[in-house]
Swiss-Prot record:
Region called Disordered, residue ranges: 37-60
GO biological-process terms attached to the record: pseudouridine synthesis; rRNA processing
Function noted in UniProt: Involved in ribosome biogenesis; more specifically in 18S rRNA pseudouridylation and in cleavage of pre-rRNA.
Gene Ontology annotations for the cellular component aspect, listed alphabetically: ribonucleoprotein complex
Protein family: Belongs to the NOP10 family.
Keywords: Ribonucleoprotein, Ribosome biogenesis, rRNA processing
Name this polypeptide is given: Ribosome biogenesis protein Nop10
NCBIfam families referenced in this protein's UniProt entry, alphabetically: PRK13130.1
Organism: Halobacterium salinarum (strain ATCC 700922 / JCM 11081 / NRC-1) (Halobacterium halobium)
InterPro entries from the UniProt entry: H/ACA_rnp_Nop10, H/ACA_rnp_Nop10_sf, Nop10_arc-typ
Residue ranges with Basic residues bias: 49-60
One Gene Ontology term of the molecular function aspect: snoRNA binding
Length: 60
């Protein structure tokens, strides 16, 4: 999922908490800002097979 909100890539080492911005760079330290939205799923999810099977059973 693509989000307009970005977070400072180095916030764990340079800031007390996450620093959010809409620009490409961090307003406090000038570092790179990255997409703050997590991936919607993990392709290597070990439980994905069971989750999909449960979803399929609920459709019937």
């Amino acid at each position: 999922m693509k989000s307009d909100i970005r977070v400072c890539e180095a916030w764990r080492s340079h800031h007390d908490g996450p620093v959010y911005t809409l620009s490409e760079t961090c307003p406090e330290c000038g570092g790179d800002a990255v997409n703050s939205a997590p991936a919607p799923f993990d392709p290597a999810d070990p439980h994905g097979k069971y989750r999909r099977a449960l979803k399929e059973r609920r459709r019937l």
